[in-house]
Structures are given as C-alpha cells and as structure tokens.
C-alpha cells in the first residue's frame, strides 16, 4: 500500500486492510482516524466490529475524533450511538473520563435527533457504567 488512504475501507465488507491497520504506528493511524471512525456508523456492517480495536488502540489520538463526533452540530446521530455504545466502552476509564463532559452534554442538552435515535439512553447507560467503575 503506497498511501495511508489506501488503508481506509472502500465499502462495508472491505476487511482486507485490517491487519495492516493494526500494524500502523500511532502517528500514521492518527492521520486516518477521522475516516476510519465513519465505518462504525452501522454496527451491522462487517467492517464495524473489526475497526473497534483499531480505533481504541491509541486512545490519546482517538479522543479528539470522538469529541468532534459527539458535538451537538454533528448530524450523524447513528454514528454517535455506536461511538457511545461500542467504541467508548473499549477505552480505559482514564480516557472515558476525558469524555464525561461530552456525554453529560448529550444527556442534559440533547438535540432532537439525539433524543429520537436513542443516543441519550446510550449516554445515560455509559455514564452510569463509568461512574460505577470510578
């Protein structure tokens, strides 16, 4: 593979680059994390579950991407749902705590779509689990 962009899945069935992604250094993987996180937007996609360990591998690099994904103006509430229910639980509690304000914002001041798509319920469940562990 000549370019990092070649490692980004081309479709929801494209798991051909998973091993190569796992071998990337943090600095290289960080460059494509915003593209990779989009592939967990539907957890029925074969690629989604395989990307979770890769996305969670370097928590300090994925935290800013998660924060951006959870912003109120981001319209992809299905992606928010899967980030909250599948990706964040795979981070250590130290990194989960870095996302507390973002999670509380969803709970206390959700957008209409965050309420409609059950993102709020997932945020409450996640917050309860984080607080239980700490």
Predicted regions and their residues:
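N-terminal alpha-helical segment
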Residues: 13-14, 32, 47, 99
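Alpha-solenoid helical repeat architecture
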Residues: 5-11, 25, 40-44, 55, ...
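Amphipathic alpha-helical interaction modules
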Residues: 34, 38-82
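Amphipathic alpha-helical scaffolding segments comprising HEAT/armadillo-like alpha-solenoid repeats
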Residues: 1-5, 26-38, 60-71, 93-108, ...
């Amino acid at each position: 593979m000549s370019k990092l962009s070649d490692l980004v899945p081309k479709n929801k069935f494209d798991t051909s680059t998973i091993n190569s992604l796992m071998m990337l250094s943090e600095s290289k993987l960080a460059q494509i994390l915003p593209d990779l996180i989009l592939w967990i937007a539907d957890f029925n996609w074969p690629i989604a579950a395989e990307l979770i360990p890769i996305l969670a591998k370097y928590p300090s690099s994925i935290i800013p991407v998660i924060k951006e994904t959870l912003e109120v103006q981001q319209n992809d509430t299905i992606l928010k749902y899967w980030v909250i229910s599948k990706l964040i639980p795979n981070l250590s509690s130290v990194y989960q705590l870095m996302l507390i304000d973002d999670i509380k914002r969803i709970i206390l001041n959700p957008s209409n779509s965050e309420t409609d798509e059950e993102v709020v319920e997932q945020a409450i469940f996640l917050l309860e689990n984080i607080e239980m562990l700490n």
